[in-house]
A protein has these predicted regions:
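Conserved, structured core segments of small domains
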Residues: 20-152
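Bacterial Sec-dependent N-terminal signal peptides
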Residues: 1-22
Length: 152
């Protein structure tokens, strides 16, 4: 009998140890507007831009391609498809920058990335990786807009 009682208490303790608690601050309307799941997360595509095989010697051409790259970044951000973008510092991996795209599939991400003139010209190669992150990440752009003094 003592063993049965001890087992029962141990079992109940284990059940409560793994129980989930609800967040008192949860806003279902906000979560739905962000496309959040029950954990406040959603799927994105993480893009790593790497040094590509093309070497563009002509400065005017290179400058034009990078201007197009920046214009494309701004367009995608304006369409709420690009959530985060930025360059990496110098590194041995030949990683040049990253994007986080608010799309559901790798195929959608490929379509968007291929609109970048620097990618099309093979200045950059890309790696596309499914990524699961905070659905609130899109709020980052609103704050970034308020603290950016000079735009590209």
């Amino acid at each position: 009998m003592t063993r049965l009682l001890l087992f029962s208490f141990s079992f109940l303790f284990c059940l409560t140890a793994f129980a989930q608690t609800n967040n008192a601050n949860y806003d279902s309307t906000l979560a739905k507007s962000f496309g959040a799941d029950n954990y406040g997360m959603k799927n994105y595509v993480f893009v790593i831009l790497k040094t590509g095989p093309a070497v563009i010697e002509k400065k005017e051409t290179r400058d034009s391609l990078f201007a197009g790259h920046m214009k494309n970044i701004n367009r995608l951000a304006g369409e709420n498809k690009l959530i985060v973008a930025g360059p990496f510092g110098k590194n041995d991996l030949k990683y040049r920058g990253l994007f986080i795209l608010d799309v559901k599939t790798i195929e959608e991400a490929k379509e968007l990335v291929n609109t970048d003139p620097a990618v099309a010209a093979k200045i950059f190669d890309v790696e596309l990786i499914p990524w699961y992150g905070s659905a609130a990440l899109k709020e980052y752009l609103k704050t970034a807009e308020k603290i950016t003094k000079h735009k590209h």
